[in-house]
Amino acid sequence: MRLLSWNCQGLGNPWTGRSLRKIVREQVPTVCFLMETRLDKNGFDNLYENLPFQNKIIVKHPDSGGGLAFLWKNEVRLEVINFTVNHVLAKVTEEDGFVWFLTGFYGWPKAQQKEKSWRLLKYLQSFVGGPWVVIGDFNAYLQASEKKSARQPQFAQIEAFREVLNSCHLQDLGYIGYPYTWSNKRPGAANTKIHLDRGVANKEWTDRF
């Protein structure tokens, strides 16, 4: 099984749509979690009905800048447990009966709302009874080296993120490739790049996968 998570920052853009189709064609994910789609269900269906996923949950955000899409193929036995504008939680059952939990997570982007993200993550843990992996854009980073900017890292926010992962028994899964997943696209000294997207999982999940 392959999992794909992408903050697409608006799927109404034709270039983004082409990029999504290309990624899906090349990576062949079984489950796909998209954030900041900026589309409701009708808009998503009109533009992306030909994507190779037979099942979907589309969550429209009251703010036009948000929105989630959680897509999966029939080949995976997946049951959605609950969802909000910031997450989708599902239970996956493998062919051998092994059960694990998958969360697509989108953290609140504003600094004053970070605590909402961590409360939500702790709340979701209460539904999990076994192996658990969380993928998405947490809108937070775990260490100072994950931010490249003229501005100082927010060490209190780093510590809060670490604490909630420890509390939920989740560990970072690491990455391969370019170290930053977001940029403010400003020139020169005003440019900021941060590693905001990641996967985290508990030991029960990493022991299996």
Where do the PLM segments sit?
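A shared catalytic/ligand-binding motif for oxyanion handling
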Residues: M1-F209
